[in-house]
């Protein structure tokens, strides 16, 4: 796109605090945004071809609340991203990310994290440091198991649909706020599903269709009645 068009977008963003430039074939993060590090609250560069975030620029958007780079070509995230202490929404669906920076747990205001359609091979332990996290979407990755660290996760909703999960730590039932757990289209045997999810957790919506067992078999597990009580109570609440 031409410089004048980009300049016009920058001028508008200066007034609104919102910079949105989608579907423009951008191959790099626009360096012109350096001028707006103290203005921007929202950046949306989805549906481009950006393969990296400039470390020296990205960490300076200290007022940024929402960052979207869905459908790009990102392979790594710089540590400097974790300087964004006001960031509440981070959406990086359909990139090529294999892991998160070790400092990711410093994004202390983060509420919504979308990483669907990446190449994550494990549940990132850094997520367990995020005390305000509400919604986590890790669907369509390559996660094979859920480790013990999951018990520290503060999220209300965890989407793990379309991974390769065959093992789940019993600690998942210790998540203090977890209400919605999506595990559709994984590699779970019924025997590998911790019964404590049904009997001893806060979970009131468990989605497990498309695994290696018939859904009706779930009803035979100990604790299913307790789960249905929570499920029904929640349904009534939103009816």
Swiss-Prot record:
Gene Ontology CC: membrane
Organism: Rattus norvegicus
Alphabetical list of SMART domains matching this protein: LRR_BAC, LRR_TYP
Major subcellular location class: membrane
Keyword terms of this UniProt record: Leucine-rich repeat, Lipoprotein, Membrane, Myristate, Repeat
Lipid anchor positions (N-myristoyl glycine): 2
UniProt-annotated location(s): Membrane
Protein name per UniProt: Leucine-rich repeat-containing protein 57
Membrane protein topology class: Lipid-anchor
Pfam family for this entry, one: LRR_8
PROSITE patterns noted in UniProt: LRR (PS51450)
Stored InterPro entries: Leu-rich_rpt (IPR001611), Leu-rich_rpt_typical-subtyp (IPR003591), LRR_dom_sf (IPR032675), LRR_domain-containing (IPR050216)
Sequence ranges of the LRR repeats: 39-60, 63-85, 86-107, 109-131, 132-153, 154-175, 177-197, 202-222
């Amino acid at each position: 796109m031409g410089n004048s068009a980009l300049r016009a977008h920058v001028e508008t963003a200066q007034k609104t605090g919102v910079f949105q430039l989608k579907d423009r074939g951008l191959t790099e993060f626009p360096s012109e945004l350096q001028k707006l590090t103290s203005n921007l609250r929202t950046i949306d560069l989805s549906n481009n071809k950006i393969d990296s975030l400039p470390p020296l620029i990205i960490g300076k958007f200290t007022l940024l609340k929402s960052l979207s780079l869905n459908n790009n070509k990102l392979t790594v995230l710089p540590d400097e991203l974790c300087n964004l202490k006001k960031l509440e929404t981070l959406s990086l669906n359909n990139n090529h990310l294999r892991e998160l920076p070790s400092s990711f747990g410093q994004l202390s205001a983060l509420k919504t994290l979308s990483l669907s359609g990446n190449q994550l091979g494990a549940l990132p332990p850094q997520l367990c440091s995020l005390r305000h996290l509400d919604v986590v979407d890790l669907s369509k990755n390559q996660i094979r198991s859920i480790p013990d660290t999951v018990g520290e996760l503060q999220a209300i909703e965890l989407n793990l649909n379309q991974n390769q999960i065959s093992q789940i730590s019993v600690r998942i039932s210790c998540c203090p706020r977890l209400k919605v757990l999506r595990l559709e289209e994984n590699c779970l045997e019924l025997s590998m599903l911790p019964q404590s999810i049904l009997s001893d957790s806060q979970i009131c919506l468990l989605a497990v269709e498309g695994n290696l067992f018939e859904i009706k078999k779930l009803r035979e597990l100990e604790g299913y009645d307790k789960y249905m009580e929570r499920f029904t109570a929640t349904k009534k609440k939103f009816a």
